[in-house]
Amino acid sequence: MTAHLPQEISSRCSTTNIMEPHSRRQQDGEEKMPLQAEDIRPEIKDDLYDPSYQDEEGPPPKLEYVWRNIIFMALLHVGALYGITLVPSCKVYTWLLGVFYNVVAGLGITAGAHRLWSHRTYKARLPLRIFLIMANTMAFQNDVYEWARDHRAHHKFSETHADPHNSRRGFFFSHVGWLLVRKHPAVKEKGKNLDMSDLKAEKLVMFQRRYYKLAVTLMFIILPTLVPWYLWGETFQHSLCVSNFLRYAVLLNFTWLVNSAAHLYGYRPYDRGIGARENPFVSMASLGEGFHNYHHTFPYDYSVSEYRWHINFTTFFIDCMAALGLAYDRKKVSKAVVLARIKRTGDGSHKSS
């Protein structure tokens, strides 16, 4: 059953307030609730949860290991561990570069691939889109198109075999294991049927996809390795192991915590029937992505949180871009909707309960 929501548009702050609640199923024996697909983003619907999909019965398929990825991740983390031993002897500019690079790259994931392109929770003008596509390339976590396709599948088929990093398969699988094995057949089957027409029509996203390997070589490998070496005389060993291996391993693991820890540990104040949790530690590590129970309850909210800037650097960044006129039409769930949802499906942990 669908419902068209009245929208309250504020031209002053360029924010769309969602005025009616959104319902979804309850799990673990609780009553299932009808889904209402709000017509607030006409260009995208395939990130809304589909309660009709259920896993097929029977034994899971045999795991097929991707040894290339296993070897790469093993070598990366060995290099990162060695990089930790080099941190005390590296120049201060080197680790400052690593922090700066990861914040920018992180925004390419959180403000770019996630909130802009996966969920269309706000709109960005060309200069901001160019910045975010470059920042996303710096992160080296798949191109925007592939990242968004996997993420939409994660929301639509959450915690089923069609979810690429299904948390029901355990912490390790949802953290990194899903990258070390072939995708479950259900992920492939459902993923190819997702509507990705909005991204296929965006020239910048498809340009990145076409030249992704070349761009990653330049922006992810060459720049962070050679800049410390050439500009302030860092040793090549320190540049490679600290500014590249260690930096990248930290960025990856902080991102992966959203898939693992934020689906297994924390409170569920907005929807007790789903696995996604509120995890402040994950929010600190991931620039604000740890308010996961809220995000899976209201995936169309640009802040992915009820509290906007609280432990949420990405929302602060988007709001700054809006103040500069580079971001607009930010979707925000109204307080009345949030409180109604807390009362109806929350676990009682919210301060208003």
From Swiss-Prot:
Cofactor remark: Expected to bind 2 Fe(2+) ions per subunit.
Sequence motif: Histidine box-2, positions: 151-155
Binding locations of Fe cation 2: H154, H263, H292, H296
Keywords on record: Endoplasmic reticulum, Fatty acid biosynthesis, Fatty acid metabolism, Iron, Lipid biosynthesis, Lipid metabolism, Membrane, Metal-binding, Microsome, Oxidoreductase, Transmembrane, Transmembrane helix
Lumenal side: 88-91, 232-235
Segments on the Cytoplasmic face: 1-66, 113-211, 258-353
Location(s) in or outside the cell: Endoplasmic reticulum membrane; Microsome membrane
Cellular component annotations (GO), alphabetically ordered: endoplasmic reticulum membrane; membrane
GO molecular function: metal ion binding; palmitoyl-CoA 9-desaturase activity; stearoyl-CoA 9-desaturase activity
UniProt cross-references to Pfam families, sorted A to Z: FA_desaturase
Annotated catalysed reactions: octadecanoyl-CoA + 2 Fe(II)-[cytochrome b5] + O2 + 2 H(+) = (9Z)-octadecenoyl-CoA + 2 Fe(III)-[cytochrome b5] + 2 H2O; hexadecanoyl-CoA + 2 Fe(II)-[cytochrome b5] + O2 + 2 H(+) = (9Z)-hexadecenoyl-CoA + 2 Fe(III)-[cytochrome b5] + 2 H2O
Disordered: annotated span: 1-42
Keyword DNA-binding among record annotations: no
Cofactor(s) the protein needs: Fe(2+)
Matches recorded under InterPro entries: Acyl-CoA_DS, FA_desaturase_dom, FADS-1_CS
Comp. bias regions, Basic and acidic residues: 21-42
Binding annotation for Fe cation 1: H114, H119, H151, H155, H295
One record GO biological process: monounsaturated fatty acid biosynthetic process
Positions that bind substrate: N69, N142, R149, D150, R182, K183, W256
Induction, per UniProt: Up-regulated by agonists that activate NR1H3. Up-regulated by a fat-free high-carbohydrate diet. Not down-regulated by a high-carbohydrate diet supplemented with unsaturated fatty acids. Down-regulated by leptin.
Enzyme Commission number: 1.14.19.1
Its job: Stearoyl-CoA desaturase that utilizes O(2) and electrons from reduced cytochrome b5 to introduce the first double bond into saturated fatty acyl-CoA substrates. Catalyzes the insertion of a cis double bond at the delta-9 position into fatty acyl-CoA substrates including palmitoyl-CoA and stearoyl-CoA. Required for the biosynthesis of membrane phospholipids, cholesterol esters and triglycerides.
Domain observations: The histidine box domains are involved in binding the catalytic metal ions.
Name of this protein: Stearoyl-CoA desaturase 4
Biological source species: Mus musculus (Mouse)
